């Protein structure tokens, strides 16, 4: 794909996701079918509830990840600056969007050394597509992705359905699994593998765990549907093809349960259709260690650093109150509280 076309595609992605509606998954994330048992006598100080955690050795003040959003286009520079500054202020993790354009043509979109200067203390996740590992210098590109932003972790995203519908997308995925395994051995930074909104099954998660990944992000169905996003960008035919996949994928809550059962000890991120801090509490109760949000943050990210801080402060308040209302003094206790129903 030519560089100008890739940049235009990233701009289109921002506009389409902001418009919402038509590209939302027809599946819900599944959190509404999870119910906590309310604790009317918590015997806790709300303000003393501890939401801090560690993920891959990095301390976090709350179990939130600003998930991969955008990389490359000029507009991404201010978005990524706002996200980095907010993550630093909040003490939460930040995952950048795909760095493919930045690596191939230098259009950094805020994905350079300045990002780490804005957020010197956060857990910072670099990002590259799995299909890019198949290129002759794919493993070198992965190392560059980490180095160019001073990242702690490299995220490899799996998006075969999106690529199948995208004009000019990567259609041959033979050898991707072996390249991920090679990367896990050769890269000094931990490797995290994520989907992009269609979910990881327990079987795929187990294969990835066996090849050496440090953590997984289920990135389940229930939020943005990237098949529909690519359909919006394409011709009438590609839009018609994409529409058939409007309800495709593994809902996030189901994916968390499946992956946790398949990989009991592997660090796990839940993302995909997380709306608020109560959804985050449910994801943690089901087995997640960290909770990510992307599209739900985008409007705030375009506005200002302060808007992003306010957005995640609200989510943190909601999570803290959910702990309080279930009698959980910290995240470990939240993982043990009873559930009323899970259909």
UniProtKB/Swiss-Prot annotation:
The keyword Isomerase applies. Pfam families: FMN_dh (PF01070). FMN binds at residues 67-70, 98, 127, 194, 224, 273-275, 294-295. GO terms for cellular component: cytoplasm. Disulfide bonds: none annotated. Substrate binds at residues 9-10, 98-100, 162. InterPro entries: Aldolase_TIM, FMN-dep_DH, IPdP_isomerase. Transmembrane segments: none annotated. It comes from the Bacteria. Mg(2+) binds at residue 163. Its cofactor is FMN; NADPH; Mg(2+). It catalyses: isopentenyl diphosphate = dimethylallyl diphosphate. Its main location: cytoplasm. It is found in: Cytoplasm. The keyword Cytoplasm applies. Its EC number is 5.3.3.2. Belongs to the IPP isomerase type 2 family. PANTHER family: ISOPENTENYL-DIPHOSPHATE DELTA-ISOMERASE. NCBIfam families: IPP_isom_2. This is Isopentenyl-diphosphate delta-isomerase. It comes from Xanthobacter autotrophicus (strain ATCC BAA-1158 / Py2). The lineage of its organism: Bacteria, Pseudomonadati, Pseudomonadota, Alphaproteobacteria, Hyphomicrobiales.
């Amino acid at each position: 794909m030519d560089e100008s076309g890739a940049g235009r595609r990233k701009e289109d992605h921002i506009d389409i996701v902001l418009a919402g509606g038509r590209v939302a998954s027809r599946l819900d994330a599944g959190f509404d079918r999870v119910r906590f048992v309310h604790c009317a006598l918590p015997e806790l100080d709300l303000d003393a509830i501890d939401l801090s955690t560690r993920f891959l050795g990095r301390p976090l003040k709350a179990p939130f990840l600003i998930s991969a959003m955008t990389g490359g286009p000029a507009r991404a520079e201010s978005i990524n600056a706002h996200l980095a500054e907010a993550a630093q202020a909040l003490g939460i993790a930040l995952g950048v969007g795909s760095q493919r354009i930045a690596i191939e043509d230098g259009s950094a979109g805020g994905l350079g050394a300045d990002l780490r200067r804005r957020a010197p203390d956060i857990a910072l996740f670099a990002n590259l597509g799995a299909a890019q590992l198949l290129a002759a210098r794919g493993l070198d590109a992965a190392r560059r992705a980490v180095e160019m932003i001073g990242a702690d972790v490299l995220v490899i995203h799996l998006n075969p359905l999106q690529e199948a519908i995208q004009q000019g997308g990567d259609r041959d995925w033979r050898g991707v699994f072996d390249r991920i395994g090679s990367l896990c051995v050769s890269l000094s930074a931990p490797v995290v593998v994520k989907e992009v909104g269609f979910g990881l099954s327990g079987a795929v998660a187990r294969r990835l765990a066996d090849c050496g990944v440090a953590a997984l992000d289920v990135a389940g169905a229930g939020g943005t549907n990237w098949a529909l996003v690519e359909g919006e960008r394409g011709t009438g035919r590609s839009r018609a093809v994409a529409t058939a996949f409007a309800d495709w994928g593994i809902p996030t809550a189901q994916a968390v349960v499946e992956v946790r059962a398949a990989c009991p000890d592997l660090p796990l991120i839940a993302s995909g259709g997380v709306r608020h801090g109560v959804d985050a509490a449910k994801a943690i109760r089901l087995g997640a260690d960290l909770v990510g949000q992307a599209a739900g943050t985008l409007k705030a990210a375009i506005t200002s650093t302060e808007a992003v801080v306010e957005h995640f402060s609200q989510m943190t308040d909601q999570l803290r109150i959910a702990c309080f209302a279930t009698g959980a003094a910290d995240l470990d206790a939240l993982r043990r509280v009873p559930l009323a129903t899970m259909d």
